Amino acid sequence: MLHLLSKDEFNSTLKSFEEQTESVSWIIDLRLHSKYAVSHIKNAINVSLPTALLRRPSFDIGKVFACIKCNVKVSLDEINAIFLYDSSMAGMNRIYDLVQKFRRGGYSKKIYLLSNGFEAFASSHPDAIVSTEMVKESVPYKIDINENCKLDILHLSDPSAVSTPISPDYSFPLRVPINIPPPLCTPSVVSDTFSEFASHAEYPGFSGLTPFSIHSPTASSVRSCQSIYGSPLSPPNSAFQAEMPYFPISPAISCASSCPSTPDEQKNFFIVGNAPQQTPARPSLRSVPSYPSSNNQRRPSASRVRSFSNYVKSSNVVNPSLSQASLEIIPRKSMKRDSNAQNDGTSTMTSKLKPSVGLSNTRDAPKPGGLRRANKPCFNKETKGSIFSKENKGPFTCNPWGAKKVSPPPCEVLADLNTASIFYKFKRLEEMEMTRSLAFNDSKSDWCCLASSRSTSISRKNRYTDIVPYDKTRVRLAVPKGCSDYINASHIDVGNKKYIACQAPKPGTLLDFWEMVWHNSGTNGVIVMLTNLYEAGSEKCSQYWPDNKDHALCLEGGLRISVQKYETFEDLKVNTHLFRLDKPNGPPKYIHHFWVHTWFDKTHPDIESITGIIRCIDKVPNDGPMFVHCSAGVGRTGTFIAVDQILQVPKNILPKTTNLEDSKDFIFNCVNSLRSQRMKMVQNFEQFKFLYDVVDYLNSGVNQASKPLMT
């Protein structure tokens, strides 16, 4: 069961589980490790997975568990409760993806979500927070290694985190080239830990190597290690034997000599550089290149390391005290090929050490394999067909309603204050929709959607798998006991009118559609169809009425549909039908059918045309709810119902400006009410802004004379 708790409820629930000594509960922190290291809730586990992995179905909960650094291994059945939190409500989409992995993995116990985010929780409950001191970037690191381990040392600088178009939130590419020899230890996708240690069986040459950790060195320890190893290493520290934190290494890594001469060159950390070429215990998304240094082993050819050939070179001597070869890694920007270089697969490169400069990945420079597609030229409608590079789209801006990074909205959206206000109102509606989606699988929630997927036969009735009705508002068919009463349709009660919003009928749901119309309408009814039968070469709706007056559509159960009248109105661009429904032992029913065939998917219609059509439809006799459908039953359907509501209310209720509070904005409240009864109503920003255009049209005083479509 999923529970969305406030900060006070979250704290009290945490304390209640802490008092239960026999219960096992996990507190999972989904923030970046840089924030987790500053402060976090007591006993919280940091799971800083890339968003791409969280959204990947193949990356199941078992792989998530493999990435969690925890000394105690437990199964899902042993965990009594799970507590999840992120920085703020903006991280709810990441929490939702992780919750889905727990549910698909068979975890059915309670999951508690912090709705206010960590910042609000930390300010109100500081006693439940653990704070640590961040390690500054300017402080060098050292690694504790067993004194008996006589190994060559790679001198690597600690670069500042850089962003790549593939992974904008992390300092490493999501894809690394293949055929790279594995590192000493298999790094996890968690940004702060190695999830596995190197075993003696896998790495027999490292029997004397002990786990190591990073901490700030002292001058005395550096001098003592220089006398032993010829490099600033410290003796082993037993206090950190059980820890193995991971320090992110981006492609922009610089070389360092053993005798640094500048302050920048003194920012060095060290890692063992001669791990044997054996398969690690588990493949990882990022690896530190590490090659064997013994003379009897063949060095990898240039083709095998071509993805790193731009910033990795082989050098005979890096440290004068080392007799074997090591690797020297330099940034790409500062590479210069020597004119006397020999054609032996490697080249001598000269550069100035710049450890704080990140990799720019310009289009004219060669790219490593994992980043080659990132700057691929593409087309965008904003540029009217011109080619542009993704890196030149401008700076990233914070996205308060979804992913952590997002491109800024189009310039035309923020061209004026009114449009910008409408844009951010729509994004707030999207955030509320995301919050409701967290309770889709909660049977006690108003947003539960379990009835739409109880069996395969029921799932086939949905035209789109991601658009289903809420169980609370769905239409239930009047069927015999033991038969499914499901249809993808929802009762909509807004204002003083009632509607039934549904998807377009499929070939297998024609009987369900007409049974719904028969049982929910009186002597007279109205159906509004807002889609064509085919759009862009794909079927959007099955024809559910006879072709002409001479033929009737007979369905199971004795239901008979015949066409009594047909008209076309070119000025309003609408076709009208009058259907007669007959059933044994029942009076006939007359259904007025309005087919608007010029309103295409994810667009908006002409204002004068749609307002004239709605005024005419409202004059047609109707004894029940109005049936409205497009293809999915959410975008055009929700926009039509919202426009109908705008025409029903007095003009003094309509907003005169867009810069109103959400609670005082009629359109915002109307769309939010529609979405609380059927998901994704008024599907995109273009349709949402169209509602404000309708209000401006009505406030301008323009009135279209309407005539009845049917008499």
Swiss-Prot record:
Under PROSITE patterns, the record lists: RHODANESE_3, TYR_PHOSPHATASE_1, TYR_PHOSPHATASE_2, TYR_PHOSPHATASE_PTP
Q: What highest taxon heads this organism's lineage? A: Eukaryota
Q: Which InterPro entries match?
A: Prot-tyrosine_phosphatase-like (IPR029021), Protein-Tyr_Phosphatase (IPR050348), PTP_cat (IPR000242), Rhodanese-like_dom (IPR001763), Rhodanese-like_dom_sf (IPR036873), Tyr_Pase_AS (IPR016130), Tyr_Pase_cat (IPR003595), Tyr_Pase_dom (IPR000387)
What the entry lists under SMART domains is as follows: PTPc (SM00194), PTPc_motif (SM00404), RHOD (SM00450)
State where composition is biased (Polar residues): 290-306, 340-363
**Where are the annotated segments for Disordered?**
275-306, 329-376
Record: active site: 630 (phosphocysteine intermediate)
**UniProt GO molecular function:** MAP kinase tyrosine phosphatase activity; protein tyrosine phosphatase activity
EC no. given is 3.1.3.48
Q: Which UniProt keywords apply?
A: Cell cycle, Cell division, Cytoplasm, Hydrolase, Mitosis, Protein phosphatase
What Gene Ontology terms for biological process does this UniProt record contain?
cell division; negative regulation of p38MAPK cascade; signal transduction
Residues covered by the Rhodanese domain: 21-130
Localisation per UniProt entry:
Cytoplasm
Matching entries from Pfam families are given as: Rhodanese, Y_phosphatase
Any idea what job this protein has?
A: Plays a role in inhibiting the onset of mitosis. Dephosphorylates sty1/spc1 and wis1/spc2/sty2.
Q: Which family does it belong to?
A: Belongs to the protein-tyrosine phosphatase family. Non-receptor class subfamily.
- Descriptive protein name: Tyrosine-protein phosphatase 2
Q: Name its species.
A: Schizosaccharomyces pombe (strain 972 / ATCC 24843) (Fission yeast)
Lineage, opening ranks:
Eukaryota, Fungi, Dikarya, Ascomycota, Taphrinomycotina
What gene is it encoded by? pyp2
